[in-house]
Amino acid sequence: MENPHEQVQANILSRIIGNVKRLNESVAILNQELVTINNRNKNLEIMGAICDNYHSSVQFNLEATNNKKPPL
């Protein structure tokens, strides 16, 4: 005699497996997008560091030559 709930449990398990597969696909796509965003952010981080270094260099040179003036 078969378990009367076996078919219901099999259907539920099948739905769970399908949902987990779709979830895994979505997470993989999300991870790819995050990698892309992180790569773009690296470029912005480098540009910010360049600007900070330039600002520090300009401030140092203005102070060294006594050409630094107060802000307007």
From Swiss-Prot:
Biological processes, Gene Ontology terms: attachment of spindle microtubules to kinetochore; cell division; mitotic sister chromatid biorientation; positive regulation of attachment of spindle microtubules to kinetochore; positive regulation of microtubule polymerization; protein transport along microtubule to mitotic spindle pole body
Presence of keyword Secreted: no
Q: Which locations, inside or outside the cell, does it occupy? A: Nucleus; Cytoplasm, Cytoskeleton, Spindle; Chromosome, Centromere, Kinetochore
Name the reported effect of N61K. Answer: Decreases cell population growth
Task: State the InterPro entries in the record.
Answer: DASH_Dad4 (IPR013959)
Q: Which GO terms describe its cellular component?
A: cytoplasm; DASH complex; microtubule; mitotic spindle
> Pfam families per the record?
DASH_Dad4
For this UniProt record, the keywords arranged alphabetically read as follows:
Acetylation, Cell cycle, Cell division, Centromere, Chromosome, Chromosome partition, Coiled coil, Cytoplasm, Cytoskeleton, Kinetochore, Microtubule, Mitosis, Nucleus
- Positions in coiled-coil regions: 19-47
Q: What is its main location?
A: nucleus
Entry keyword Cell division: yes
- List every position bearing N-acetylmethionine: M1
Q: What else is known?
A: Present with 967 molecules/cell in log phase SD medium.
Give the family, as the similarity comment puts it: Belongs to the DASH complex DAD4 family.
What is the annotated quaternary arrangement, including any partners? Component of the DASH complex consisting of ASK1, DAD1, DAD2, DAD3, DAD4, DAM1, DUO1, HSK3, SPC19 and SPC34, with a stoichiometry of one copy of each subunit per complex. Multiple DASH complexes oligomerize to form a ring that encircles spindle microtubules and organizes the rod-like NDC80 complexes of the outer kinetochore. DASH complex oligomerization strengthens microtubule attachments. On cytoplasmic microtubules, DASH complexes appear to form patches instead of rings.
Tell me the function of this protein.
Component of the DASH complex that connects microtubules with kinetochores and couples microtubule depolymerisation to chromosome movement; it is involved in retrieving kinetochores to the spindle poles before their re-orientation on the spindle in early mitosis and allows microtubule depolymerization to pull chromosomes apart and resist detachment during anaphase.
Q: Which PANTHER family match?
A: DASH COMPLEX SUBUNIT DAD4
Name the UniProt record assigns to this protein: DASH complex subunit DAD4
What is the native source organism of this protein? Saccharomyces cerevisiae (strain ATCC 204508 / S288c)
Question: What taxonomic lineage is listed for the species of origin?
Answer: Eukaryota, Fungi, Dikarya, Ascomycota, Saccharomycotina
